[in-house]
Amino acid sequence: MCPGNWLWASMTFMARFSRSSSRSPVRTRGSLEEMPSVHHPFLNVFELERLLYTGKTACNHADEVWPGLYLGDQDMANNRRELRRLGITHVLNASHSRWRGTPEAYEGLGIRYLGVEAHDSPAFDMSVHFQTAADFIHRALSQPGGKILVHCAVGVSRSATLVLAYLMLYHHFTLVEAIKKVKDHRGIIPNRGFLRQLLALDRRLRQGLEA
């Protein structure tokens, strides 16, 4: 299993950091429905973190967060037996590097591969990959029997950010709606830089709908 204790410890650390950086307290328990601010047109980063710290915080090596869309970690990406059992046809690796992830790793499985060389840093511009990743996910799920694993090292930040962007771009979810949908199935915690980029996407998409 994805180490739930590790994820909770990370959330607790970030919550403490947020409290020292903002007057708004970070809530680490409760249900998503208890969040009074989720109906606000746009949340700020600290409010989004409060939302992320509520509800489900555990995760497996991979969790189906949308029909046919699995969000997971590097261990699942390396497990050919599990990929075959789940019927995975596509893999999107958000932590691609020279040493981690190649199309050749899936030779004989009939899996199509896309690598995104992203760093889990607030300074990294993930937004340049939003559309390409969303298009790849959409193509995977549009084919008969298509199933996709979107992963990074742990499956909670880089890959989660790309999944959220996909739901926003192709299914017209707001960012809050996308977070709640994914968190119904898996704990996630995109870094603050990624949250700001998703907020910018949220504003752009909603302004386009209102135009």
UniProtKB/Swiss-Prot annotation:
- GO MF, one annotated term: protein tyrosine phosphatase activity
Q: Which Pfam families match?
A: DSPc (PF00782)
The UniProt entry's GO CC annotations, sorted and at most eight, read:
cytoplasm; Golgi apparatus; nucleoplasm; nucleus
Give the SUPFAM superfamilies listed for this entry: (Phosphotyrosine protein) phosphatases II (SSF52799)
Question: What is the enzyme's main class?
Answer: hydrolase
Q: Where in the cell is it found?
A: Cytoplasm; Nucleus; Golgi apparatus
Q: Which InterPro entries match?
A: Atypical_DUSP_subfamA (IPR020405), Dual-sp_phosphatase_cat-dom (IPR000340), Prot-tyrosine_phosphatase-like (IPR029021), Tyr_Pase_AS (IPR016130), Tyr_Pase_dom (IPR000387), TYR_PHOSPHATASE_DUAL_dom (IPR020422)
Enumerate the UniProt keywords alphabetically. Cytoplasm, Golgi apparatus, Hydrolase, Nucleus, Protein phosphatase
Q: Does the keyword Nucleus apply?
A: yes
Q: Which reaction does it catalyse?
A: O-phospho-L-tyrosyl-[protein] + H2O = L-tyrosyl-[protein] + phosphate; O-phospho-L-seryl-[protein] + H2O = L-seryl-[protein] + phosphate; O-phospho-L-threonyl-[protein] + H2O = L-threonyl-[protein] + phosphate
Q: Which GO terms describe its biological process?
A: negative regulation of ERK1 and ERK2 cascade; negative regulation of MAPK cascade; negative regulation of transcription by RNA polymerase II; positive regulation of cell adhesion
Catalytic residues, chain numbering: C152
Keyword Nucleotidyltransferase carried by entry: no
List each copy of the Tyrosine-protein phosphatase domain by range.
60-207
Enzyme Commission designation: 3.1.3.16, 3.1.3.48
The family classification in the record reads: Belongs to the protein-tyrosine phosphatase family. Non-receptor class dual specificity subfamily.
What role does this protein play? Inactivates MAPK1 and MAPK3 which leads to dephosphorylation of heat shock factor protein 4 and a reduction in its DNA-binding activity.
Description of how the protein assembles with itself and partners: Interacts with HSF4.
What is the designated name of this protein? Dual specificity protein phosphatase 26
Q: Which organism is it from?
A: Rattus norvegicus
